Design a protein with these regions (language model features):
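Short, flexible helix-coil linker/hinge segments at the edges of structured domains or between repeats
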Residues: 84-88, 130-162
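Glycine- (often His-adjacent) and acidic-residue-rich active-site loop
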Residues: 59-95, 143-145
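Glycine-rich beta-to-alpha active-site loop
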Residues: 100-144, 169, 179, 190
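Hydrophobic/aromatic residues within transmembrane alpha-helices
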Residues: 57, 70, 122-123, 182
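Amphipathic alpha-helical blocks and their helix-capping loop/short-beta junctions
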Residues: 184-246
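Conserved CoA-thioester-binding segment of acyl-CoA-metabolizing enzymes
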Residues: 1-58, 98, 244
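Contiguous mid-protein beta-loop-alpha structural module that forms a pocket-lining wall or clamp
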Residues: 151-206
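A glycine- and small-aliphatic-rich helix-loop capping segment at beta-alpha/alpha-beta transitions
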Residues: 69-79, 125-132, 153, 159
Length: 246
């Protein structure tokens, strides 16, 4: 299974790995309806294909994994009176997020560079969230008056090192998580030395062997570790008025 090289998502099967490569670098891989459709169809096909043992999602560009949903597409659609079409865009995106969260096979997201908004939607719900030292993440939607979506308002409270207060902090502030922060709260499951080498071993040896070979330790303490007590004290309240007063 392959797609043409000008597709916004390159789809292939390498050995026993279904590979999704986000291929819209000029737009920092922001997700549009075509990309969501391609990813969804590939995942549906591989789910019941015994020859595919695992799924990899990555980017062709080292600058960005994915900068989020295509906000310009949605804005232009609303202004053009295409409300139902834009509603369908979000329905399809959220359905894809749910599919990833419940996927029965290892779903390995390799995150290098920018990971924002919808980029977390196609990565943070998977079984393996593998980052490099160049990765950083945020949910910046509050800055444009939008909710923390793509399931992250739920997931960010439940990552192994997170809490409801930490999830509220991440969503309400749009805080930019470093690679150390991503490991601290459990958004990332593994930190690796090199994305390219890891991917080659993932395809050739399987995810567990590749992680054994390439996982490294975090080199510096996460900022969130030092702020954790203050975040819990401030963002554990149930309303913005109470948070602001704290």
């Amino acid at each position: 299974m392959t797609t043409q090289t000008d597709s916004p998502v390159l789809v292939s099967v390498r050995h026993h790995t279904g590979v999704l490569e986000l291929n819209r670098p000029r737009a920092l891989n922001s997700l549009n309806p075509e990309m969501i459709g391609i990813i969804t169809r590939a995942l549906e096909q591989w789910r019941d294909d015994d020859s595919v043992a695992q799924v990899l999602i990555t980017s062709v560009s080292p600058k960005a994994f994915c900068s989020g949903g295509d906000v310009r597409h949605v804005r232009d659609g609303i202004l053009a009176g295409k409300e139902e079409e834009m509603d369908r865009f979000f329905t399809d995106e959220y359905s894809m997020n749910h599919m990833i969260a419940s996927y029965p096979k290892p779903y390995v997201a390799v995150l290098d560079g920018i990971v924002m908004g919808g980029g977390l939607g196609v990565s943070a719900h998977g079984s393996h969230r593998v980052i490099t030292e160049r990765a950083w993440a945020s949910m910046p939607e509050m800055a444009i008056g939008y909710i923390t979506d793509v399931g992250i308002s739920y997931a960010s409270q439940r990552w192994p090192g997170s809490s409801p207060a930490m999830g509220a902090f991440i969503g309400l502030t749009g805080y930019r998580l470093t690679e150390a922060d991503m490991m601290e709260v459990g958004l990332a499951t593994h930190l690796i030395d090199d994305a390219g080498d890891f991917i080659e071993d993932l395809v050739g040896l399987g995810v567990d062997n590749a992680l054994d070979e390439h996982t490294i330790e975090v080199k510096e303490e996460a900022r969130l570790a030092g702020w954790r007590d203050d975040i819990e004290a401030t963002f554990s309240h149930g309303s913005w008025a109470d948070i602001d007063a704290a």
